[in-house]
Amino acid sequence: LITGLVTLTAGCKKKDMSLKLNEPRNIRGVVSYKRSFPDLNDKHLAVAQAVGICPPEDRDAAEKMKEQLIHITDNQFYTVDSLTHSIPYLVPRASELLDTIGSNFLDSLTAKGLNPNQIIVTSVLRSQSDVKRLRRRNGNASANSAHCYGATFDVSWKRFKKVEDEDGRPLQDV
C-alpha cells in the first residue's frame, strides 16, 4: 500500500513551468562585420548567374520555372517571413545551403548555452517586376539583383523565431 502511494504521488509531480533561462558561455562578438561578412555584390552576382536560373520577367514566368526550383517553407531549421517582394523558391544548391545554415545556427545556439531559435528567411527569388517595385520603396535595392537567379536568400540578423520547449515552458529571448 505504501509503495503504491509513493508511486502514485511521484507520478503527480508538477511540471516546472518557470522561464527557461539562457546559460551563455563561450560567446565572442564580431570585431569587423566588413571583414567577417565581405558582402561583395559583383562576386555574389557572378556566382548567382553561374548556378541560378534565367531571371524571370514576372511571377507568372517564375511559376513556369518551378521544375528547376525548390519551394521553401517553414521547417525545423528556419521559418519563412511573409514575403512581399519575392517568392519562396530557390535553386537546389541554395536550398541545401539554407538548410545547412539553419541547422548550424541551431547547433551554435546549443553550444553557446542559448535557447533554440530559428533563422527567419526574409527574401528569396525575385522577378524583374518584383525588383522594380522594391526599388520604388528601397533606394538601396540593386537593379541587377542576385535574387533574380534563385540562388540568393536573405535572413534577418536581429529577428529569430523561438523553438517552443517540448514541455511548454516559456523561453528567455536570445
Where are the model-predicted features located?
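Extracytoplasmic cell-surface/polysaccharide-interacting catalytic and binding patches
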Residues: C12-A111
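A general, composition-driven signal for non-globular sequence regions
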Residues: T7-L8, I120
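Cell-envelope/glycan interface and biosynthesis
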Residues: K66-V174
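Bacterial N-terminal signal peptides
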Residues: L1-T7
